[in-house]
Amino acid sequence: MKMNLPDLAYTIMMNDKADKLLIKWKDTVILVGTPNDVFWMAQSCLVVTTIKYANRVYIINVEIEERVDGI
């Protein structure tokens, strides 16, 4: 099952499991922020591929999911 980035950020935010999320796409950091920041700023087309956790920081790799409707 694919999970998009805003959904994951919301889950982490509700469980109070992290202080920071570091979001990477193709080995490039594209966003660093609190789970709340990421929830409001991230796009649903960003799909989580891998997750690493250390010291209340999640390192999340994402890919861009292209949509049929072009949006």
Task: Give short role names for the model-derived ranges.
Residues M1-M3, I64-I71:
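Short intrinsically disordered terminal tails
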Residues K2-K26:
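N-terminal acidic leader/helix
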Residues K17-I64, V68:
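Acidic, low-complexity, intrinsically disordered interaction modules
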